[in-house]
Amino acid sequence: MDDPEHIQLEAGLYIVATPIGNLDDITLRALKILKAVDFIAAEDTRHTARLLSHHRIKGARLISYHDHNETNRTPELIDRIKRGSSVAVVSKAGTPLISDPGYRLIKMAVAHHTRIIPVPGASAAIAAISVSGLPTDSFVFEGFLPRTKGNRIKRLKELAVEKRTLIFYESPRRVLTLLKDIQTIMGDRPGVLSREMTKIYEEFVRGKLSAIISTLTDRSGIRGECTLVVMGGQIKGDVAETTLRAEIELGLQNRDETLSAIAKTVAKKYGLSKNRVYEEVLRIKNEQ
């Protein structure tokens, strides 16, 4: 007897969001599609197999698709779709392509006029900011910052002048280093560290960055993938010294702009005295 819940899918690329922790955090539509597609391209086939087993989906044809084989696997998947197959893409957790593999595949699919179907669902970034208590009307998702200290610091200096709420991903091994770098560059801003979201040991560490650092430093170890939400920079008035410095340093990178012009631009942006900012510009310029 035919399964009444089984659906017939058109050939195409289905971008399917999966749970970020709790295996029940998946949409009914996603389950129907995972059950019906010809192939599932999975970042971690073993993890996906557990998800399918939990929801009693049998007979799925899994294909590994991750950072290390993305280049070679992409044309193969496009070819399968061209020949009439339906292919679902899933990451280990959350929405595919959001700090996960898949960009090359989508780019090639667009170039080949392949049908692309989003199947939305869980996202750690959205889950974290929704419970952060920080402004949610406008935000910047940065994902994972560079692992090398120099490149990471450079990016943080660029972000120090960002007014919108910032969202970062980081591994438990490196999250304390990231927190310290952000505090050094951006000042002691409010933030929220979300850990093990939707799982048994779900935790949210809130407060100034210094307080979050202190809490984590007192622990013997940190477990679980982490999402860090940080307050954006001040818009007017009392600007953190680190934010002001980062803004000036960005201006100094433009060799064609005069020191006076840099001071005028920064002063206007933050509602500060031009003379005060000009003094800072001169001081930072002399340090370089």
Per-range role (PLM):
Residues 42, 118-121, 168, 193:
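General beta-strand structural signal in soluble alpha/beta enzymes
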Residues 10, 86, 165, 172-287:
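A contiguous loop/helix-start segment that scaffolds small-molecule binding in enzyme catalytic cores
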Residues 12-16, 85-91, 139, 164-168, ...:
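Generic beta-sheet signal
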Residues 34-40, 113-117, 165-166:
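Short active-site oxyanion
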Residues 1-66:
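Glycine-rich, flexible N-terminal cofactor/catalytic loop recognition
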Residues 104-162:
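Class I SAM-dependent methyltransferase SAM-binding "motif I" and its flanking Rossmann-like core
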Residues 65-71, 145-148:
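Conserved helicase motor
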